[in-house]
């Protein structure tokens, strides 16, 4: 069995931004790995001069875990305090693009729509007027099949642009961990695609 240090060296995490999505106690029952193994890996990665970011569903957005309690949970799972001291924490919330995801709209089509909204400073798809929709449909007529337009026009639900987009925009050389792969992790992936930020996913620590 390969050691964590060997995995870190083999995968080449040096200088990467490791963005961990919703690896927190509320979701531990659905994970396919042990939180302490993930924390031990982060300790090794941090030693390779990587930046560590924790995106989580917390007290400010969803009334869930506080940042202090989250940090204590990480320490209980063997995360080094030196890693904690330099890590970045962001209470992100969720369900920005879930209506499209849950209705099986193509990820690239959702990302294109999110990019259009972001670049045109439209935070809520319900604020899209006829002119904005026409502009979007023209811009992506060769790639999208009006899936987003058809879905949102027929429902009262929406896509909204979270502050998370501005946060993610700062980072490069991104490696993702966490989950859920068809839920919050996918929302982060779509946000990165919309921002045209290349990323990879480390499947050993996804759920």
Language-model segments: which ranges?
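A short glycine-rich beta-strand->turn/loop micro-motif centered on a GG-aromatic cluster
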Residues: 175-182, 197-207
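Small-residue (G/S/T/A) turn/hinge positions that recur once per unit in extracellular repeat modules
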Residues: 146-148
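Catalytic cores of soluble, metal-dependent hydrolases
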Residues: 165-166, 181-187, 194, 207
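A short, acidic, amphipathic alpha-helical segment used as a generic capping/interface helix at domain edges
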Residues: 156-170
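Active-site acidic carboxylates
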Residues: 1-141, 169-170, 189-201
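Gly/Ser/Thr-rich loops at beta-strand to alpha-helix junctions
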Residues: 58-61, 179-185
């Amino acid at each position: 069995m390969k050691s964590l240090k060997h995995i870190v060296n083999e995968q080449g995490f040096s200088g990467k931004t490791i963005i961990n999505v919703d690896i927190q106690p509320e979701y531990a029952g659905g994970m396919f790995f042990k939180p302490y193994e993930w924390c031990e890996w982060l300790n090794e990665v941090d030693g390779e001069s990587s930046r560590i970011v924790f995106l989580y569903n917390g007290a400010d957005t969803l009334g869930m875990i506080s940042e202090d309690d989250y940090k204590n949970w990480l320490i209980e799972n063997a995360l080094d305090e030196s890693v904690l001291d330099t890590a970045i924490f962001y209470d992100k919330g969720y369900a920005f693009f879930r209506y499209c995801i849950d209705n099986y709209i193509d990820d690239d089509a959702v990302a294109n729509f999110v990019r259009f909204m972001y670049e045109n400073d439209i935070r809520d798809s319900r604020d899209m007027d006829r002119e904005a929709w026409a502009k979007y449909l023209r811009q992506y007529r060769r790639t999208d099949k009006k899936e987003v337009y058809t879905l949102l026009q027929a429902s009262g639900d929406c896509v909204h642009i979270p502050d998370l987009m501005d946060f993610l925009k700062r980072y490069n050389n991104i490696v993702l961990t966490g989950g859920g792969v068809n839920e919050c992790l996918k929302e982060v992936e779509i946000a990165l695609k919309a921002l045209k930020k290349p990323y990879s996913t480390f499947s050993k620590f996804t759920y």
